[in-house]
Curated annotation (Swiss-Prot):
It is a multi-pass membrane protein. The lineage of its organism: Archaea, Methanobacteriati, Methanobacteriota, Methanomada group, Methanococci. Belongs to the UPF0104 family. The chain crosses the membrane at residues 32-52, 70-90, 123-143, 164-184, 198-218. Its main location: membrane. This is UPF0104 membrane protein MJ1078. It is found in: Cell membrane. One of its GO terms (cellular component) is plasma membrane. InterPro entries: L-PG_synthase/AglD. Pfam families: LPG_synthase_TM. Keywords: Cell membrane, Membrane, Transmembrane, Transmembrane helix. Disulfide bonds: none annotated.
Amino acid sequence: MFINSLVPAKLGDVYRGYLLKKKTNESISLGVGTVFIERVFDLVAMISLLFISAYLSFKSDIPKEILYSIKWGVIIILFLIILIFGFLIVNSKINLKNKKLEAILMNFEKGLKAVKLNTLPLLITLSFTGWFIEGLTVYFIFLSLNLNLEILFGVFSDLASSLLTAIPLTPSGLGVVEYALIYILKLKNIDYSGAFAVLILYRLISYFSIVLFGAIMFYIVERNILKEPKNEKY
């Protein structure tokens, strides 16, 4: 999370693969494959919970922009699923002469298959629970500012703004998330002073705290990694 808060394009996910290699002696490509499939499940949980919270918050008056975002979220999920199955089919049929590239692709496939069918219910439950708990952050901010908004709207606000971080344009969605959160709060007729107060507290919790404590942990982790022997698995 710390790396993703500093660099665009979700490059922090590659760093997670690097850490997996250092800690377990597994390849980076296997770690990236595991992170990729994790992101797909996260996106499924996010879009599903976003639709539920939007419907319960707005009933039949869900803003068309929100419906548009949900529609594109579903399209992205379907595209990723097709991409995964396409990769698995193609990778099982090709025979590469480059052994290093072949090892990278095989380990990536191994990472994609790390999720077993019998673990799916638990994984989906944890994803839903995780996103719901994260959504409570905004609701508690509402309470601290004496804003009379329901808990599901807090969850919806967090999910709708977090969805933009899945589009790796800026580090942690800087700029686009702020705009989205202000826009969402205006849907409930929150004035700009209240909306900006929510935004400042939200970013202090969801961004600057990660940068601060993440920097400390990054220093500790990297210092330990430098002491470990190198290996050459890809």
